[in-house]
């Protein structure tokens, strides 16, 4: 398997990357939440107090929280975004979003989007919003979108054959129809359960007019992959405001994201679980001290191995564990205290039964 990333970077000078613009008006960052609760699993939860702390920070630091539809339209139409643009999203339509999150978001007058998996709503799951609650959200201007019908693992399957693809698309289309039947027109957006996808699924969604969202970190710009848009997780261990501040202020590293390699590593089919990223700089004109570009793999720092003035590689120092892993790369923006950010998620899968998450 060829693990090649072709990046389009601005000029590097003294190890720092020159900014493309004076501000981030051509990109925006998306925050991802699940539960707003002190009793649900901590890994996907943030307390009401922590969540309000995030909202207050956005307010006092002049971030512009905008709705996702407007943000996407501005990028796709080449129109400027507000400076420091942020979008708020939730996955899974948990009831605590309605009970705990909605009052706070109304207090700050912040728009948001909820990605809904429809089966739990149909089954009257006590932890999930009802259709009446979702209708009330839509009436209040909240955007509702597709998170599949059952939150299944979409790509942890033995074979990626036509039968698999048809079943996966049926799942997505069923949820889209249920949302439309109950709520009226909804956008053709999909949030991948667990942020997991492969190239076949991305292409099928592109051909059917979907925009899709992962759970890898980073911002959104015109050069993004519209079937794998990144979002910054902001709950659980990612809820710490000190670390979140850096992410909020970051800009997406300019790159050809659609050229990123298939993120699924099939160890049962001979794929190696130490994937190598081969990075080609395409707009660098001058390269000075190179140490300023850093990558982090499963929490460990990995410096790039420079092959030439235009090429470097990054590889995990040891085999990645089963499940989801990320390569994150950052570089300081010249003249600013902020960073460019790039993330690529790998799924190491050997055909085993998926875990319960």
What are these regions (language model features)?
Residues 1-84, 106-112, 118-129, 162, ...:
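Terminal accessory/targeting
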Residues 26-43, 82-86, 94-96, 100-200, ...:
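Metal-dependent polysaccharide deacetylase catalytic core of the NodB/CE4 family, i.e.
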Residues 68, 114-116, 212-220:
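A short glycine-rich beta-strand->turn/loop micro-motif centered on a GG-aromatic cluster
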Residues 144, 213, 218-253:
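Short histidine
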Residues 174, 179-183, 206-217:
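Catalytic-core region of carbohydrate-active enzymes that cleave or remodel glycosidic bonds
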